Amino acid sequence: MTKNILLRLFISVLLGFNVTLTISAQDENHGHSAAALQLIKGQRQWFDTHNAAGMVYDQTPNYSLLQFNYDQKNGNFHRVYTAEKQQQANVYTEGNLNLGKVLAWGEFRFTHENERDARFNASLNDPYRGQPFFVVDSGQPSKWRHQNYHLRFRVATPIVFQHLTFGIQATYKAQLAAKQRDPRVDARFYQLQLQPGLTYALTAHDVIGASLNYVSQKEQSDMSLENMQRRLHYYELYGLGTAHKGIGIGRQTNYYGNRWGTALQYEHHTDRWKILGELFADKLVENVDISFTTPRKDAQIAERNLGFKVANSIYSKAYIHQINASFNYKSTNGITYLSQRDNTASSAGWIELHHDIRSTYKTTDATLNYVLTRLRDSEYSWQGAIGIDYQGLDDTYLLPVSVKKSKNAMLFADYRNNFIVGKTMNQRLLLDVQLMMKRAFSGKYAYRGANNDLITVREMEPLDEAFLTADAQGARLSLTYSQLLRQQTNINGYVKLAFSELHSKAKTFNSRRNVSVTLGVNF
């Protein structure tokens, strides 16, 4: 009950914040087309860092938006825990406001999602969040229902004492999920993130910044059976297919952890050039306990991230050139515990006997893209982009040695054209065409344990590796029509239709399709 009240309070606060944005924005601008709003967001270099104190250097104008979206995905070209059919409806609101003495930005998203034909996962809300210790079932297709709440805001000062700015970003997430087939699961994930920061202007053209990152997160997973006459098998995962097989009602699992990190930023800017770089590092320790009444420590992950981002923009009267690059290396140690039951009256519970690192997980992510924008007044006439996203996975179970590796790249080319349909009502038609190509350079899965007959080894992990090492190609097409709702106002309404398909020639897969419809207004 308390959590529901807090969520409603967060929603009310943010909606009230956006109403304020609306009133202020109507007095200051002539409204934003869909392309104009994309252009505004695409120029926010500090927004993509961990430091909210840099908001003043982005010089983002006031805006506010509210949109409703329906999204549907289907097809068998997906990773092993992803559902074959997904239906998602969400409401999203966002706004930016400069009050003079403070700069503020905020967003809220509520998502309801139904999944059909999801396999294996029987424990976590999101099995891809980097936690390898969870429970799976025998792979029978199941339905899932998700409700996700996401609230984030940034506040910052303008430049004070001639050189300094201060800011903070806060994020709250609540994700609820329920599996609809035995063994059932009720999974609840909560996360609170705080990121305070500051910047210091060295000269009129150079700025340095520093920020801290703290995250507290918790997930509770409670398994159950509705049909007690049928006892089903489940599997407790310990890495790369290694699992303990169980039968019956399942287990209660408690995940809780904290992340600490820091980031440094440097910006150099002139009238025609702006470059911003960020170096960041953090560490997450997350514990895995079984049972809520008499908890037994089962496992722990120790995750480290190290990365950087560089955003470079060159401006002229007619064009903007942007080159963006990022790199992140994540290294995770999977630690398992050996415990003994202590049933003495004075200290009933579990005694830890031993723990050690049994598995390691290494992920390398890198991106590089170039964007060319042809300006037209406060929006763009057209925009082109090319880029590549690379990911390398290198996972190892130490004894007996098992490995899972892959190297992938996704290449894309994107073109957007913003057609003027009418000037009186600011009518625009935005066409967006994107071509995609996924290429797998290498990969393998090799299990060398003693339980080759487990379904986690025979089917689950090989199926996931097959996706990671499959080539694919696809395209995405979207149309966005926008116009003023009333001539004397600054409120632009828009409707967006999007379709994409990714097709693979691999024997195991076929394709994945995505259809999306969005209705919204912005100010």
Language-model regions, residue ranges each:
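Outer-membrane beta-barrel "beta-signal"
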Residues: N29-G31, A204, S511-F523
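Outer-membrane beta-barrel translocator domains and adjoining extracellular loop/strand segments
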Residues: N76-T82, D117-S123, A178-V185, S221-N227, ...
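Transmembrane beta-strands of outer-membrane beta-barrel pores
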Residues: F68-N74, F110-N114, I159, Y172-L176, ...
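Outer-envelope beta-barrel architecture signal
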Residues: T60-S64, G100-G106, Q162-F166, A204-I208, ...
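Residues on the lipid-exposed face of transmembrane beta-strands in outer-membrane beta-barrel proteins
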Residues: V91-L97, L151-T157, L194-Y200, T262-H268, ...
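Short, flexible helix-coil linker/hinge segments at the edges of structured domains or between repeats
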Residues: F120-V136, Q180, Y214-Y256, V285-Q300, ...
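Long, internal scaffold/assembly segments composed of regular secondary structure
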Residues: T242-I386
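Residues that define the transmembrane beta-barrel architecture of outer-membrane proteins
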Residues: K85-V91, R145-L151, R188-L192, Y256-T262, ...
